[in-house]
């Protein structure tokens, strides 16, 4: 598997840069990293807070062949698993909060914005814009629960080393996707889900409730079971975690 890397000092958004690149390199994986993003995006209207040179910021593009639109969430699972696997070598207590955040206990260490292009019934390409909090010691935005590797371990970590670990892990999980091993990737994802056991607090348009995680469906919807035994299915942003 071939990977083409582009390194930038400063950019508005690595996702935007990669999406508008005129001539895409002929590689299985194309990735752009930046020391600083002036408009790094999170989900919706959110912005990813990052002190210059302190964190890992990258966008990764793949052009998979044969991944059906109905199973496109497997790509999100694979990338999230790769980020977690890299961080697993540096600390413990990590899990994946649906849909693709990496959590250390109840705090967010990494998040990803995904942009997918479709061609007919299949995925044409997919861009993962990821931020991983590495060496930042203080967060000033109103983000509710950020944490960095530096805050966890008490020491600085080489950012390029973390990046190499992510790419190495991604190659393994992405190879599973290309081989059609969607259920295998999904099983690995479910095994490390945040709140995968027990009853926890959530809220939706009808108010707050207690529920347990049942599964994440192929289409990426989260399935919860409330105290009455009723299954509730949610797309992203339709349910909130009460942390």
Report residues per predicted region.
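Long, positively charged amphipathic alpha-helical accessory segments at protein N-termini or as interdomain linkers
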Residues: 65-70, 74-94, 104-243
């Amino acid at each position: 598997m071939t990977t083409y890397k582009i390194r930038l000092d400063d950019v508005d958004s690595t996702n935007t840069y990669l999406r508008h690149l005129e001539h895409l390199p002929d590689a299985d994986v194309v990735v752009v990293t930046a020391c600083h993003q002036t408009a790094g995006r999170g989900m919706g209207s959110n912005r990813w807070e990052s002190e210059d040179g302190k964190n890992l910021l990258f966008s990764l593009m793949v052009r998979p062949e044969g991944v059906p639109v109905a199973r496109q969430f497997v790509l999100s699972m694979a990338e999230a698993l790769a980020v977690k696997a890299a961080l697993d070598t540096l600390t413990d207590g990590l899990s994946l909060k649906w849909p693709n955040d990496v959590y250390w206990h109840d705090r967010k260490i990494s998040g990803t914005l995904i942009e997918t292009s479709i061609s007919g019934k299949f995925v044409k390409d997919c861009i993962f814009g990821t931020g991983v909090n590495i060496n930042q010691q203080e967060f000033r935005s109103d983000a509710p629960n950020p944490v960095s590797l530096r805050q966890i371990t008490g020491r600085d970590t080489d950012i390029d080393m973390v990046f190499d670990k992510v790419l190495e892990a991604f190659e393994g999980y992405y190879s599973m996707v290309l081989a059609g091993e969607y259920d295998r990737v999904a099983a690995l994802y479910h095994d490390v889900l945040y709140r995968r056991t027990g009853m926890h607090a959530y809220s939706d348009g009808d108010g707050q409730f207690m529920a347990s995680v049942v599964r994440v469906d192929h289409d990426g919807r989260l399935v919860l079971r409330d105290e009455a035994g009723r299954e509730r299915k949610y797309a992203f942003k339709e349910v909130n975690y009460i942390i």
